[in-house]
Amino acid sequence: MYYPFVRKALFQLDPERAHEFTFQQLRRITGTPFEALVRQKVPAKPVNCMGLTFKNPLGLAAGLDKDGECIDALGAMGFGSIEIGTVTPRPQPGNDKPRLFRLVDAEGLINRMGFNNLGVDNLVENVKKAHYDGVLGINIGKNKDTPVEQGKDDYLICMEKIYAYAGYIAINISSPNTPGLRTLQYGEALDDLLTAIKNKQNDLQAMHHKYVPIAVKIAPDLSEEELIQVADSLVRHNIDGVIATNTTLDRSLVQGMKNCDQTGGLSGRPLQLKSTEIIRRLSQELNGRLPIIGVGGIDSVIAAREKIAAGASLVQIYSGFIFKGPPLIKEIVTHI
């Protein structure tokens, strides 16, 4: 497969520049006959989850296609689902560059992107143009300059605008790169947010005559007690699914490596065990009451199977996809 050569060239570039260059090429082919260049035939392995039928259990995690610019090209590679975003009500530039770093030896990434995106209206226009036949998740967050106390309003604005176009909606309250965001995972703040989101979901269901499930994305850095509280809140509010996990602030597995001290969330292989352990504990706590989408360091069939054995119904990749390329999709879907 050609990807090792492509990767070698891309890894000569700054990580964000490599991402921009790749997306420039994907934008050129998305929705055109040239999509055949990236198309892969993968077996159908349907999974029912959150009331939806996924054509296979492997999805693309949020963060790669923030604005939904390359949905069709990414879909052609064989993903059973694609989660676009995180998107916010208003466009925002994100944090200062550089803000994305490779830990090549660990096959990890550190990012402090800060929800850079072109805003929800732009994303909706891109979704309208897409022809992807898998499940499209849309991941939403709050603008950096929205006070945390008013954060729920940003989620409700996004929900209203994307509801008609989303297969499911992911609520991102676990990015470490938006000040105060992770506080929404706890206690009263979480209950308040989930109440508002569930009420909005009910209103939108009545308006659009369709039910769009809601999944909440959580951090891997929760204590045992916090995890129990989160699980309890999700069940009490009838949330449809949980995505576990986002990136970690823990650096214990990458000490001494180049870029290890950069601020931001660590993803990729160093997150693998930590996220699997959260999934296992969450699964025990939830006891089948809502499904788990497992994400964090999946870079092989074995890693994907470990997430499913720990209790995940579906899995997603991001960093592994950067390091291994499209062949990883085919390998996981074929052998999982």
UniProtKB/Swiss-Prot annotation:
The keyword Cell membrane applies. The keyword Membrane applies. The active site is at S175. Substrate binds at K66, N111, R112, M113, G114, F115, N172, N177, N246, T247. It comes from the Bacteria. It catalyses: (S)-dihydroorotate + a quinone = orotate + a quinol. Keywords: Cell membrane, Flavoprotein, FMN, Membrane, Oxidoreductase, Pyrimidine biosynthesis. GO terms for molecular function: dihydroorotate dehydrogenase (quinone) activity. Binds 1 FMN per subunit. GO terms for cellular component: cytoplasm; plasma membrane. FMN binds at A62, G63, L64, D65, K66, T86, N139, N172, K217, T245, G268, G297, Y318, S319. InterPro entries: Aldolase_TIM (IPR013785), DHO_dehydrogenase (IPR050074), Dihydroorotate_DH_1_2 (IPR012135), Dihydroorotate_DH_2 (IPR005719), Dihydroorotate_DH_cat (IPR005720), Dihydroorotate_DH_CS (IPR001295). Its EC number is 1.3.5.2. It is found in: Cell membrane. GO terms for biological process: 'de novo' pyrimidine nucleobase biosynthetic process; 'de novo' UMP biosynthetic process. Its cofactor is FMN. Monomer. Belongs to the dihydroorotate dehydrogenase family. Type 2 subfamily. HAMAP family: DHO_dh_type2 (MF_00225). Catalyzes the conversion of dihydroorotate to orotate with quinone as electron acceptor. NCBIfam families: PRK05286.1-1, PRK05286.1-2, PRK05286.1-4, PRK05286.2-5, pyrD_sub2. This is Dihydroorotate dehydrogenase (quinone). It comes from Escherichia coli (strain SMS-3-5 / SECEC).
